[in-house]
Regions:
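A generic structural motif
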Residues: 57-66
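Ser/Thr/Pro-rich, acidic low-complexity intrinsically disordered regulatory segments
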Residues: 2, 37, 44-45, 140
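N-terminal, charge-rich interaction modules
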Residues: 2-38
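Short catalytic helix/loop segments, enriched in acidic residues and glycine
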Residues: 38-57
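Mid-chain, well-packed structural core segment of small domains
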Residues: 79-114
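Structural motif
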Residues: 74-81, 136
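Ser/Thr/Gly-rich flexible loops in soluble cytosolic domains mediating phosphotransfer, phosphorylation
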Residues: 51, 108-142
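Short beta->alpha junction loops
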Residues: 67-76, 128-130
Length: 142
């Protein structure tokens, strides 16, 4: 299974206790030269991970308890996300642009939205537009 889960610790401030699940495609599995990813010039796996990690650290510094959940393109994605949802109650679920904006990933996006709706109906959704604006997306909602 090609997944990666990382956790950060929350700091004591106004956002302490707010938990966030960051869901996205595992960048190591993405072919950034494919036409579907032409909208993201210069992106590669290392840049995506660096952006996600930096924003995860930024959220932790703001007091959020964050967990990153990286999935494949659908073979195990639902099971991987469901496992995270069963481990913890999240206040906010962020689903990355790689899942949402690539037309071939539309069905995966739809499945993940319905999965979260069923297993975490209280959670807010937020959406980033690139790996480096995840913190802003979270802060809009919690």
């Amino acid at each position: 299974m090609n997944t990666e889960t990382q956790s950060t610790t929350r700091n004591a401030n106004a956002t302490t206790g707010k938990s966030v699940l960051i869901v996205g495609l595992d960048p190591a599995l993405i072919d950034f030269s494919a036409p579907a990813f032409a909208a993201f010039p210069g992106m590669n796996a290392a840049r995506v991970m660096a952006g996600l990690t930096a924003d995860q650290e930024r959220l932790a510094a703001l007091g959020y308890d964050t967990r990153m959940c990286l999935t494949d393109f659908g073979e195990t994605a639902e099971a991987v996300v469901l496992a995270q949802l069963k481990q913890k109650q999240f206040d906010c679920i962020m689903i990355g642009a790689g899942v949402r904006v690539i037309p071939t990933h539309f069905i995966l996006f739809e499945k993940l939205i319905n999965l979260v709706h069923e297993h975490a109906p209280h959670a807010r959704f937020c959406f980033n537009t690139k790996p480096t604006d995840t913190a802003e997306a979270v802060q809009r909602w919690i």
